[in-house]
Regions:
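Short, conserved turn/kink motifs that form compact alpha/beta structural patches or helix kinks used as
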Residues: 27-110
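Active-site-proximal polar cores
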Residues: 1-29
């Protein structure tokens, strides 16, 4: 995977860990509370043939985000620049840490 991070393409990205609560019947509810952390990073479509082979048609609903190192985890919610919904439209599905950058694969929520 190529780690190309171009400053001129940086955009504001917000991320927030979900809050999980368990009901009396054992059901788990996911909510998004708190203030999302903000970072500037590069968002790209998934282009590698390996990623497209792994994810198939899902790859059309996925993006690659390259951000400064931070506290990112699979399942965290993501808002891209200009998205102002209460719940995040994107979820982190993979995290790869590099020397000074982190690569996130995000998928649009159904």
């Amino acid at each position: 995977m190529s780690m190309r991070h171009l400053k001129r393409r940086e955009t504001l990205i917000k991320h927030l860990a979900p809050t999980l609560s368990t009901g009396s019947m054992g059901s788990v509810t996911v909510t998004w509370t708190g203030t999302p952390a903000q970072a500037y990073g590069d968002v790209q479509p998934l282009q590698s043939s390996q990623m497209r082979a792994e994810y198939g048609e899902r790859a059309d609903r996925m993006r690659l985000c390259i951000l400064p190192n931070g506290s990112y985890a699979i399942g965290d919610g993501i808002w891209l620049d200009g998205e102002a919904t209460t719940d995040p439209p994107w979820l982190i599905v993979s995290v790869s840490k590099w020397q000074e950058l982190t690569s996130l694969t995000i998928e649009m929520r159904a």
